[in-house]
Amino acid sequence: MRHSKTAISFFILVAVLGSQAGLIQDTVKEDRPFNPTIIHQGFQDSSDCCFSYASQIPCSRFIYYFPTSGGCTKPGIIFVTRKRKRVCANPSDQRVQTCISTLKLGPRSGNSAIA
């Protein structure tokens, strides 16, 4: 008889604690509403952004250029070589402005960010 009282007391205790744990978990879920992370860069063409500028600008190796998109953190001009390599340049640099005046504005293509 003593074991049955202990067992019943134990099951009542487990039932009470279990229901309390469920209430606490529901309260915690209600306190933190679902706020999905929004990544704004997905809507911008970050593949055509410059993160650094080349120090040497050999105009004779470039076939065309295009400016970076407006969503980039740094302004830039991307020059494309005959071998289709891309070179980022500072649009404020006088040498870059000279290259721009001699080259044609080209298409914006490719999917890799420029370092």
UniProtKB/Swiss-Prot annotation:
Report disulfide bridges, numbered on this chain: 49-72, 50-88, 59-99
Keyword field contains Cell membrane: no
Protein name in UniProt: C-C motif chemokine 6
Kindly state one GO CC term assigned in the UniProt record: extracellular space
> Where's it found, cell-wise?
Secreted
Supply the InterPro entries for this chain: Chemokine_b/g/d, Chemokine_CC_CS, Chemokine_IL8-like_dom, Interleukin_8-like_sf
Q: Which PANTHER family match?
A: C-C MOTIF CHEMOKINE 6, SMALL INDUCIBLE CYTOKINE A
Instruction: Please list which residues make up the signal peptide.
Output: 1-21
Transport is among the record's keywords: no
Q: Its gene? A: Ccl6
Task: Extract the Gene3D superfamilies matched here.
Answer: 2.40.50.40
The record's family statement is: Belongs to the intercrine beta (chemokine CC) family.
Please name the SMART domains in this protein's record.
Answer: SCY
Primary location recorded for the protein, binned into one broad class: secreted
Q: Name one GO molecular function term.
A: chemokine activity
* The entry's keywords: Chemotaxis, Cytokine, Disulfide bond, Secreted, Signal
Please give a single GO biological process term from the UniProt record: osteoclast differentiation
